[in-house]
A protein has these predicted regions:
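N-terminal "arm"/small-domain region of PLP-dependent enzymes with the aminotransferase-like
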Residues: 1-67
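Conserved N-terminal alpha-helix of the aminotransferase class I/II PLP-enzyme fold
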Residues: 46-94
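Conserved PLP-enzyme active-site core in the AAT-like
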Residues: 3, 11-16, 43, 64, ...
Length: 250
């Protein structure tokens, strides 16, 4: 590929080139670019089903990207201010689990709010890491849980100086943000990683007057969801990492 810029769309452009070749498919998916399922073609449109194709050399492979997917990940990392970006399948759940599984091992402690997504708990079950919960305050008027107070994070770190990481929701499901910069700083001062579940904060990277995003705050890893708040189709995610870390992208 030529020089990359933020106006480039490597994967889409590769799909368009492939579509124009009028390849006759003998592989998956079974609808054979709409030929085998006219009802689906009528519902989604011929162009859409023509682009629903399997991994092959012109389109790269997500398991080991070497061309257009790699280029797209590099552009994503640049756009989000991360050192690396990784496109994921399996929802932001898989991105969050990747962060936890790659940061903690059996017996390691991880400090996190009680209102984390269940994907975090699933990851702890898988790898045997030990949760150290911080109970967020509840807004009595709205009836919703708030973010992690920096004082409570400091107490948890003091009581568990051997913890490996701190995980933060940015924002919570209700749009509540913690003091992310201060939490990142505190975690790093105690040689702990800071992981951020940013499933509902993709827009923080591009909007004006937005709360600070994970990469700007110096977090080590963050998981963002492009479909929840980034405007893409359902089930598109990413993981990213900071200057010396990575980004997981759903």
């Amino acid at each position: 590929m030529g020089i990359l810029s933020q106006t480039s769309a490597p994967v889409y452009e590769a799909l368009e080139r492939f579509r124009k070749k009028r390849v006759v498919p003998f592989d998956v998916p079974g609808h054979k670019r709409g030929r085998g399922n006219p009802e689906l073609r009528e519902l989604l449109g011929e162009k859409c089903v023509n682009l629903d194709v399997n991994s092959m050399k012109p389109l790269d492979n997500l398991c080991h990207p070497v061309s257009v997917i790699r280029d797209a990940e590099e552009l994503a990392a640049e756009a989000f201010g991360a050192a690396h970006a990784f496109f994921m399948v399996g929802g932001t759940t898989s991105s969050v689990q990747s962060m936890v599984l790659s940061s903690c091992k059996a017996g390691d402690k991880i400090i996190l709010p009680r209102n984390v997504h269940k994907s975090v708990i699933n990851a702890l079950v898988l790898n045997g890491a030990i949760p150290v919960y911080i109970n967020p305050q509840v807004d009595s008027k709205l009836g919703i849980s708030l973010g992690m107070e920096i004082g409570e994070v400091a107490k948890a770190i003091k009581a568990n100086p051997d913890a490996t990481a701190v995980l933060v929701n940015n924002p919570t499901y209700y749009g509540i943000c913690s003091d992310l910069r201060s939490i990142v700083k505190l975690a790093h001062e105690h040689n702990m990683l800071c992981l951020v579940d940013e499933a509902h904060g993709t827009h923080f990277y591009f909007g004006k007057n937005m709360p600070v995003n994970a990469m700007a705050a110096g977090a080590d890893m963050a998981s963002v969801s492009m479909h929840k708040s980034g405007g893409s189709l359902y089930l598109s995610w990413k993981e990213k990492t900071c200057a010396d870390g990575s980004l997981l992208w759903e």
